[in-house]
Amino acid sequence: MPDVNPSRRQLLLGTGAVAALSVLGPPAAAAPAAPGAHGPEVTGLGPGNSDFPLMSATLIDDTLWIGSRNLAPARVIGYHLPTGRVTATVELPTGNFVQGSAAHGGVLHLGVTDAPGAANLYRYDGTLTALGSVPGADVRDVAVAPDGTLYATGRQKGRAAGPGLYAWSPAGGVTEVASPAPNATQGRAVAATATHAYLGVGSNLAGGGGATRAGLYAVERATGAVTDITPPDLRGDTIIRRITVLGDDLLAVSTEGAPAHVALLDPADHRVLRSFAVPGTKSVTNFQRRGDTLWFTSTEHGVLWRHDLATGALDQLAVPVPDGNSWGLGRLGDTLAGVTEGGTVWTLDLGTGAVATRDLVEAGAPAAAQLGMSVAARAGRVYVGGNGSLALHDLAAGTVRKLPVPGEAKDTVVLDDGTLYLGVYSSQGIWRYRPGTDPAPVKEAALPQEQNRPQVIRRDPDSGLLLLGVQADTTGGGSFVTYRPGSGRPTVHTDPLGPEQLVRAVAAGHGQAFLGGDNARPTGPRGDLAAWDPVAGRELWRTATDLGAGVSSLAVLGNTLYGLTVNGRAFTVDLCGSRRPGYAPVIGRRADLGAVSGANPRLLALGGALYGVSERSLFRLDRDTLAATVLVGLDAEWYSGARLAADEHGVLYTLRGRELIAVRP
């Protein structure tokens, strides 16, 4: 995607380079920026990351209907394959992910997430119609039976019965059909024939602790009878990822696993005709069929696979977008068409094997600011993470450039030489970007597949190591990772806070790494603290706490460890003597910051000052009393908690709404 110069930024910065340098120019020394005479100086820098991230695609005739992800309002666009242009845009009044998508009779059916108490099922036939609501659900998948009945499933947090299969019809509205897996954390796939509806469940989020693994259920539509038809080879996998009816004689089922599996069933009696592993693949997502040829895509590696139904042969047909996470696959004659989450459409000519790709924004998709994932800054560059990309803001030039990154850059850190390191979800590991050398971010090291969700990445100034805290969505727990930049060899310490706690917070100081724990499940231990020698790879101490909540962020300033809990409580630990045998950490001062802090706040130690950020506000903490002084109200829109960065001149960067701002405190 070419450099863009947002009009919003032009309005805010005027002449671009001159304005940026005059407002954000470096002070004489690399120290925290001096406060303005009348409080903080705040400069708007335009949308943090403006793009068209996506999460679904369904082909109707010659148009690929593509659902957005993390945009407000949520929307669906029509991409016309013959011309390579976006020809329609439909905005939805509710929702965040447009994840469920299915066609029937030339009509598009949709399901969305994040629509509490409002419609999360829609139909579009040239006019958008709200159909109703699956109660309490983030809708993950929808399917339409031959008679027009719409089926849906999703994630219903806290529901004792587990994820349900729901049906919508004009006569009955939305009704519950079955809830056969109370210990699964979400429903992920549905399909329907004239006689049966199918539900695929599992626990790829908030797993562990006895959560159900992959389960496939057939529901007889006439009687409501439920039968577990999970193929044996799939039972050990994490979740059923896709169920697709491919004619009267074939039902294709895929999983997320290590590796992923595909099973082919006879819809008449649900016999398993064939099942096989897909090597090197975490998730298989979308199917298409013509005669004895089956095509399918994978999420993490961008591979388009071909399977011969007659011989059983399996081969990699193409990699249309390297490392592109696939969210849709269609066929128009001799052309396969798919999409990847960073806003790319690809086509493959089955006759010639030629692959073409198209950026959706260049094709006319309405780019908009997406929810932020991460932020980092140095040397006049600010990076804002999103879905499938980083936005690189060049402050001097006044430009923004899209850097493709598969998945989500959950946290980022810039080294003194300007090299950016990223912890990337899901199961993407550690990535690197060297400005002026790397044309795009590159993967430098893999992590174990189950250690899929980096929460934090920090640099230890004493050892030069990168320190990561990671969450394992599928098994529970997490890991503490140390990594020497450039080595390609991370050291992974699994479950350093026990098998149930993820490592949400990491801080470095005094030659130690300090870890803070949380728990993705509603019950179980959380809030533990630990200290590690990152070079020796050994625990120095560990303690449970009475914080009553998970630890969201940690920072070291002087001889004090400062922390914030996920519900906005500040605390301190005196680190004097923390490396001596017999040291017993004690929670010292405490303060309730609920008045200024939202969920999952973060800390940043900068020079002698301590700053905090939440979706509600940017604030300064008094080192002695923990009293908070609000610097800027934010009402920020992040995907998983606010982030805060500082450059070498002491200028702070975060989001206000979805706009990137620079703050000279």
Language-model region placement:
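Short glycine/acidic-enriched loop and turn motifs that connect beta-strands
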Residues: 70-73, 114-117, 156-160, 204-208, ...
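Conserved beta-propeller blade signature
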Residues: 64-67, 108-111, 150-151, 197-200, ...
